[in-house]
Every structure is written in structure tokens, then in C-alpha cells.
Amino acid sequence: MTDPRDNLLDSHLVGEGGSNVEPASDPTLYGHVTLDGQTEGIEARSYQTFRLTYTVGRYGLDDTGAIRIAFRAMSDFGRLQMADPTAAGYTTATASNGCRLALTYEPRGHNRPRFKSLTIAVGGGYLREGDTITVVFGDTSKGSPGMAMPTFIDPAFEFKVYADVVATGHFTPVPGTPAVEVRPGPPVVWHAVLSSLRRPGETFLFGVKAEDKWGNPTELAEANLAFETTLPVNGLPSNFAYEKGNRSHAFEGLSVDEEGVLRITVRNADTGEALAESHPMVIRKGAVSGYWGDMHGQSGESIGVTTARHYFDFARNKSFLDATSHQANDFQINNAFWAYLQELAAEYNEPGRFCVLPGYEWSGNTGVGGDRNVFFREEGRQIHRSSHALLTDRSDINTDAPDANILFEKLKDEDVCIYAHVGGRYADINFAHDPKLETAMEIHSAWGTFEWLLTDGFPLGHRSGLVCNSDGHKGRPGASYPGAATFGAYGGLTCFITDELNRDGLFDCLRKRHHYGTTGTRMHLDVRARFNGDTALFDKDPNAWDDAQSAPADSIMMGDIAKVSGDTATVSVEAITQAPIERIEVRNGMDVIHTLRGFDKPDLGARFRVIWSGAEYRGRGRQSEWRGRARFGGSTIKRMSKINAWNLERRLEVSSADTIAFDAMTTGNFGGFDVWLDEDPDGMIEIATNHGTLKVRAGDVGMEDTALDAGGLERRIRIFRLPEDNTCRELSRQVDVPLKPEGDNQLWVCVTTEDGFQAWSSPMFVFRG
């Protein structure tokens, strides 16, 4: 039996504040709504036409009154417009009695969570009971292709109707929200998913799925699959019939007996075609394994889409995560939804298989500390909200924590871990930070990449780990594509290095900072250091804890805090990746001390990589638009490969024999392309953008960046050369890093792979004494 709490339509779980005033006590008197058009099985990002009819109720609809159809804020359906009848999104409306109607579409025209709205105002008359207003979304009568649907699946894409029947400017919901079902399109890519580190004999799962072109797992795929493995895998069949109707399949309870690197190639058993290759998984004896989580996202009960149950199911069964948490904005979490989240966390938490941490997002404005993620070890704890902004129940308002320092004070005796993050309201860690509670900085999400959130803490003496998550709003934790609207990046993941997959293991890992983050890929990353003198390894931060203890150590790992007598660290880095490694930066604080590559200058070919990156500023409007062209004078482009071009509707293409045209967006992350030229060129390269032009002779471009700073927040254009075919997917190096005599040395690495993904290790905090 379906739980009614899993249906978002007009749900009492949705944090959606309204007014306590309205024309009558019975909302059915304001009219009713019907929707005609295809309502089921609509393909994501297809063009559709819908006819919505509002029938006026007993109160009539006054002159200058209006109706409003509102949509979810994070839905990326195509923009509605009334100006061009031949273009997408053309929308019309007519009144049955001939009244004049004025249509206005606004991206922020209504209240959260339904910012996007179409308002239809009556002029030159009024409507009586029984009169109608008919709205055609995607009116194709004059050549429009229709209304572009969202890029992601949505079991209930809502047309929420409100009416201002007495022309007060106050809109009241009309009962009976129409909705349509958006489903995945046909498959275009297969994925094979493994974890990254297991011990011999330890069980793991292997996930297989097919996605449509927008990243939705699709049930339209079918194939006879064959698996090729680099190590013998206990429990994995050699062949598998993947049938239609399934959006994924997980092979559980697998194990490998011998040490090595496991990669699994998925082939079409009938044709031999390679469909996918898995992430690498290292099988190694030791005390720990690597478990992957996306701990930050939300669903339609707050600002996202789909339901909380769908969210947890996707994390476990579609993106094959080991761990997750639901992080709704606190000012939208009513008490019924908070209680339901506790139930779901307990239901889905399965030690050893899938770890769920109960939690929420404390969503204070930046001026009072900015966004924080709160994770509890157990269910049933008190939520301390930043405000009750969208909550009508005020009975527990005295439990609020209106700034981040108050939040830390209220949670000081709780068993919690806290992240700071950058979303709509970026965290100000100078305003508030508690090193006992706030263990990590989230430096990548679907909002972009934000190394500065971590590095801001270096001069303040903070010793925080780093994490990456999706902060996804589209119901796809662990595989969160940005779509075609607000978000600019693929969602991140965190690898927790710990001895057991359960809440205790994750909390221990977070408090030791033994984790690393990626921009969405899975790779094995091991970072350690040893020193030319005595080393004292602390069990916790001695600057925060009076009872911190230290013990002699031969070496330390990512996240550790140590006092050393020597002046040099020998940092060892091991990276084993899915795609070839472009570079690894070894850093001390904000300085890059070494750049490691698996190739050298003689290996370079006529392959150039062009990268644009950065943001406008730190806040919500951080999107940087990149429009322009790159011309490779005197050469012919043999082929071009896109990098992080997530929005399929933005231009990135070969526009002539020697030119690439682009229209892109970054939000602190990077995008770009590789180009292979017909010969080793020596002509002039010109990359002209709306933020500046970079000119350089091709012969002067090497494997180091040639860059142009372009204002904004770390905004720049770069070009460098790569080998024609870089095959380095495993890189192990040791390098010496001089230690500063005073203060912390924050030793960490950043790995960049050729497919556009990055990974960062939590810093090792080393001081001399």
C-alpha cells in the first residue's frame, strides 16, 4: 500500500508558508482546474502542449483580479514566453467571455518553493461563476515546438494554481493541483560503478545502469551483458541479461581474494562492444576501506523535486552509494516532515550496506553565519532551525538558533558533526566556527567549486577536513547532473576512509578528517607524509581540546594533525583513476609546491586543452557566462572533445576548419575542450571571450598553463598541451615539501583527470616544535 506521505501533491509535509487570510472558509468557492494533454510517460526535455482550464467559482473573478500558475523553483523546464509564437515556450490565454488578459512570466514571481510563475490578469471586464480562462502552454498553432519539459524525471510535475478573485493582490491556492509524469528518455550511455578500496575477502557491490542524455537512469535499456575483470571476483556472473523496466542493477555480496586493482569492463555480449568500464577499486590488506557518500541534498518537501523516499531509494539503488543524508532547508521543515525524516533514516539505515545519518541544513543568511549541514548520530534529536520563515506552526520557535554561534552553543552537548557549505547562503567561517563540532568544509557541489571556503580558514588557524557533495535538488543524490538552469556543475562525492560502514565509523572518520572529496567521480587516493625528525600524532586538535593526546608516529595520513621536529615533509601520493591523470598538485596551504604528471615534454602532441573557470563572486549570483570563439590559425581541427559541458543546449562546437565556438557557464568550477590539430602547429591561437582575449603562438604553449586572468572570483582562461593519447591512470610519487617554521603547514593534494573531474585530500595539519 502506498504511503500518502510519499505523494507531494498538496502534501502537509511541504514547507510552504501561506497567509491566514482568504476570501472564504471553503477554498472550493474560488473555482476549479482541469488539465488536458499527455499526463503520463512524458519524456524528459521533450516538447509538449498542455491546455489548462480554470473555471471561475462562486466569488467570480474581479476586474484586475488574476490567476497564477506556479512551478517548482528548481525545475528546469523551458522558459515560458508570449513574444514569439514560433519559439519554444509560447504561451497563450483566452477568457470565455472575451475579457482582455495580460500574461506575465517571472522566474521569481511567487513564494518559495514555487518561484517560477505565470500570472494572468483580467482587464476591461470581469468573470462570473462558470466562466473560464484557458491557458495553452506550448501553443503550437503558429509554429512553436511546444513547452520544453524538465531535464530530470519527476513523477509529479505540478501546475499549482492560485487565484486572486477579489483583486487584492493576495493569491489563494485553488484545490486540486494538476500534475504530469516526466520519465527518462532512451539510453545513451552505460555506467559501471565500484567503490575504491576494499580488503581481501571483504564484500562489496557492483552497480550497472544506463542513463538517458540528461543523466536519468532509464528503464528503456536492454542488453545481454558480459563482464571482464582484472581480478577474479567471487559472486559475479560472467553474463547478465539486463532487461527493460529496470533503471539499475546491483550485484551485491561480491568479494576478491587477492590484492591488486580491480576494473570491470561491461560489454555487449552479442556484439563485443565495450559499453562501460568501472571505476578502479584497490584490493589491499589493511585496517580501513573507502566508502562513498553524498551527504547533502533535498527533495520536494522543501525546495527540490520528488519525494524524500525517492531520494533515499535513488541514493542506495540508482547511484550505489554507501552513505547519504537528507538535508532540507530548516525553515521549510515542519514538525511532521522532521518526524518522517527520522522514520526514513531509520528505515534505510543498514549497517554494513548503507549508512544514513539523520540531519538537516541550518539555513541562516550569510550575515549570521551562512549555510551549515548538521548530522546526528541518532534519530529523534531536536532540530534547531535558523528561522520559521515558511512554517505556520510557531509552537517550537523558542528552539530556533538565529545565528551560527547560537547553533553551536545549542549543539555543544549533542553528538553531531557539522559541515560549512556554499549554496544560496554561503558560510562565513570567520563569523562562526566551532572546531569541536564543525569538522569539514564542503568545497564542491552542484553549485560549483569553492576551494576558498577551506583556504579562508588557514590563516584563522582552522583545522577542517574537506568534503564534496551534490547539494542536489533534482532527486538524484550520488549522480546529480546540473540540468539546464541554475546549477553549473555535476554533484560531488566524498570517500570516507574508515574501518566499518556504519554511523560510528562515519563519525569517527569525520572527526579524524580521514576523507577526500571529488567532483563526482570515484578514484582511489592515498596521501601520507613522513618527516626528517620526531613526529607526534594527535588524536584530536590540541588547539580545541584540552585533553588531546599525542603519540609517536612513523607517518601520518590525510586529515591528521602532527607536531614535528624536522623541517621537511616527504609527501607520498597514490592516485588510481578511471580516466587518465592530467596533473596532481601537491600544496602547502595555498601554494602549489609540486605538479606531478605521468608524462613529460617529449610526450606532448598537437593536442591543446582550453579551459575557462571561476565565478562572478561568492554569492547566489555567482554564474559566469562564457561566450566566444577559439581560433587555431594555420591549422585544421581533426577532432574536438568537450569537458564538463553539462548543459546540452549550450553551444560548444567546431564552427569552421580552425575555430571552436562556445557558450558556457561556470560557477567556480571549470569547463572547456580538447582539440587535436592536423599537425604540430606554430600559428597564432586566439581565444576571444566576453571576459577578455588570450593570444599566444602555438609553439609557445607547453604543458604548463598559459593563462589570462579575467576578473571576477578566480576567473581565468587557460591553454596548455597534452599528449595525443595519455594512458597514465595510476601515479605514485614521493616529493619533499619544506615546512614553514611558524604556524600550520596544510599539506594536501588536488588531482585533475582528463575527463574534467577533480579530487582533493583533506589537509594534513603539521606544525613544528
Feature annotation, model-predicted:
Residues 1-189:
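Ser/Thr/Pro/Gly-rich, low-complexity intrinsically disordered stalk/linker tracts of secreted
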Residues 40-47, 60-61, 196-202, 558-566:
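Short, solvent-exposed loop/linker segments at the N-terminal edge
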Residues 42, 48-51, 91-92, 114, ...:
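Core sequence-specific DNA-binding domains of diverse transcription factors
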Residues 52-58, 137, 206-210, 570-577:
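Aromatic/hydrophobic beta-strand junction motif of beta-rich domains
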Residues 193-197, 213, 217, 224, ...:
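C-terminal functional module detector
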Residues 259-262, 275-276, 280-409, 756-765:
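A metal-dependent hydrolase metal-coordination microenvironment
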Residues 260, 339-346, 392-436, 451-463:
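Histidine/acidic residue-rich metal-binding segments in metalloenzymes
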Residues 291-294, 322-327, 355-359, 373-375, ...:
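Structural recognition of the beta-strand scaffold that forms the well-ordered cores
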